[in-house]
Structure formats: structure tokens, C-alpha cells
Design a protein with these regions (language model features):
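HotDog/MaoC-like acyl-thioester-processing domains
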Residues: 73-78, 82-131
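Catalytic strand-loop segment that frames the active site of acyl-thioester-processing enzymes
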Residues: 1-37, 124
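Hydrophobic beta-strand-centered segment that forms part of the acyl-chain substrate-binding groove
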Residues: 28-37, 41-87
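Generic structural detector for well-ordered beta-strands
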Residues: 1, 68, 119-121
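A generic structural signal for short beta-strands and their flanking turns/coil linkers
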Residues: 6, 16-18, 58-65, 79, ...
């Protein structure tokens, strides 16, 4: 769950103190009617939720190809991530690989709030010569 404390902590960490995130009185005057989480907080949370799903050893994030913020995330929202593998490519004599992912972040109402595509370098499950 995204909490008010998460949003405040992210504002401190990132330096993004936009009042839409941290000032309830200001946020009440916006079309959202209340504070919303930073888009990058949602992206970071999605990354954390995805790290072991599916289980593999991630070496590095290589590229974030796209991110779309589809709907606001409010404090109190419960998020989950739907992950789809779009492409796999062997690298490093088969010891590593690049995986292209699509990740959809969905709230408790099954509404997609964020979507994106990224590439990670992962350790191969088996060396290429055994496949």
C-alpha cells in the first residue's frame, strides 16, 4: 500500500516537493481533490515488487524504454504489478541475457495506473552450451 509517509519520504529523498504531493490544502483545489503519489515513486515501487517475479538474478537495468502514467495513485492505494516478457536475448557467451519486459501497475480496483517497457540484464539460468 502507498501511504502518506511513503509520499512524504519520497519528496524528501527526491527533492520533489510539488504541492500536489505534499500539501493537502493545495491538492484539494486540483482536479484530483487530494494528494497523489509521485509518478516516480510508483515506478520505483513497481521495480521493487518485480525484482523476484519471476525469480532470477538481475544484474542491471539497461534501459527504460517507456513509462506512461495512466491514472493517479493516491495514498491508501494497494498496487500490484502484471509482468509480461516481450523478448529474451543471450549475451556474454550465453552467461547473461537481456530481457525486455512490459510492466503494468494496477491498483485495488484493477485499474492500470502506470505502464512501461524496460530491459534488464540477467544471469542465464543455464549456460548456452547446455541448451
Amino acid at each position: 500500500m502507498i501511504t502518506d509517509a511513503d509520499v512524504r519520504s519520497f519528496a524528501e529523498l527526491s527533492g520533489d516537493h510539488n504541492p500536489i504531493h505534499v500539501n493537502p490544502e493545495y491538492a484539494a483545489t486540483t482536479p484530483f481533490g487530494r494528494t497523489i503519489a509521485h509518478g516516480m515513486l510508483t515506478l520505483s515501487r513497481a521495480s521493487g515488487m518485480s525484482i523476484n517475479h519471476p525469480p532470477m538474478r538481475t544484474i542491471a537495468v539497461v534501459e527504460i524504454r517507456s513509462v506512461k502514467f495512466c491514472a493517479p495513485v493516491f495514498p491508501g492505494d494497494v498496487l500490484r504489478v502484471r509482468t509480461t516478457v516481450l523478448n529474451k536475448e543471450r549475451r556474454g557467451r550465453g552467461k547473461r541475457g537481456l530481457v525486455t519486459w512490459r510492466r503494468d501497475v494496477v491498483n485495488q480496483d484493477d485499474k492500470v495506473v502506470q505502464t512501461g517497457e524496460s530491459v534488464t540484464m540477467v544471469e542465464a539460468r543455464e549456460p548456452a552450451e547446455k541448451i
